[in-house]
């Protein structure tokens, strides 16, 4: 159950980052203020809930194991950036993502 909490904390953290990115996207001047407030408000909500879940994780998992698992954020953000904003990702970046996943598997298997 705690590992599921860690995954949700990671996903909410990523959602907060993606909302911040969306807040920076261009919109008409007449809608800009509402757009920014909406997306930054969602970002704060996601990041706040992620922090609460993260505290629950830290109560049950050594920080030396739990913290590296947040590297999943790099993986989620890369995938979302490609899907949502069609951002280019170099082969070198994908290689880095693969190393991150490998590291998470290695660290996760030590528990």
Curated annotation (Swiss-Prot):
Keywords: Cell inner membrane, Cell membrane, Lipid A biosynthesis, Lipid biosynthesis, Lipid metabolism, Lipopolysaccharide biosynthesis, Membrane, Transmembrane, Transmembrane helix, Transport
Stored SUPFAM superfamilies: Multidrug resistance efflux transporter EmrE
Primary site of residence: membrane
Disulfide links within the chain: none
The organism's place on the tree of life at top rank: Bacteria
Stretches assigned to the Cytoplasmic side: 1-35, 82-87
Record GO biological process: lipid A biosynthetic process; lipopolysaccharide biosynthetic process
Gene Ontology cellular-component terms listed: plasma membrane
Cross-referenced InterPro entries: EamA_dom (IPR000620), Flippase_ArnE (IPR022883), Small_drug/metabolite_transptr (IPR000390)
Gene Ontology MF, one: carbohydrate derivative transmembrane transporter activity
Pfam family, one: EamA
The keyword Transmembrane helix is assigned to this record: yes
Biological pathway: Bacterial outer membrane biogenesis; lipopolysaccharide biosynthesis
Membrane topology recorded in Swiss-Prot or TrEMBL: Multi-pass membrane protein
Localization per record: Cell inner membrane
UniProt topological domain (Periplasmic) ranges: 57-60, 109-111
Transmembrane spans: 36-56, 61-81, 88-108
Subunit structure: Heterodimer of ArnE and ArnF.
Similarity field: Belongs to the ArnE family.
Role according to the record: Translocates 4-amino-4-deoxy-L-arabinose-phosphoundecaprenol (alpha-L-Ara4N-phosphoundecaprenol) from the cytoplasmic to the periplasmic side of the inner membrane.
The protein's name in its UniProt record: Probable 4-amino-4-deoxy-L-arabinose-phosphoundecaprenol flippase subunit ArnE
Protein's organism: Escherichia coli O157:H7
Source lineage: Bacteria, Pseudomonadati, Pseudomonadota, Gammaproteobacteria, Enterobacterales
Gene label: arnE
């Amino acid at each position: 159950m705690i590992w599921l909490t860690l995954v949700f904390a990671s996903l909410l953290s990523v959602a907060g980052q993606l909302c911040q990115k969306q807040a920076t996207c261009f919109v008409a001047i007449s809608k800009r203020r509402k757009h920014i407030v909406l997306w930054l408000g969602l970002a704060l909500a996601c990041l706040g809930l992620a922090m609460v879940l993260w505290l629950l994780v830290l109560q049950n998992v050594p920080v030396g194991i739990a913290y590296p698992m947040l590297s999943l954020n790099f993986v989620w953000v890369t995938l979302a950036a490609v899907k949502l904003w069609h951002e280019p990702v170099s082969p070198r970046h994908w290689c880095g993502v693969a190393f991150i996943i490998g590291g998470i598997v290695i660290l996760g298997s030590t528990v």
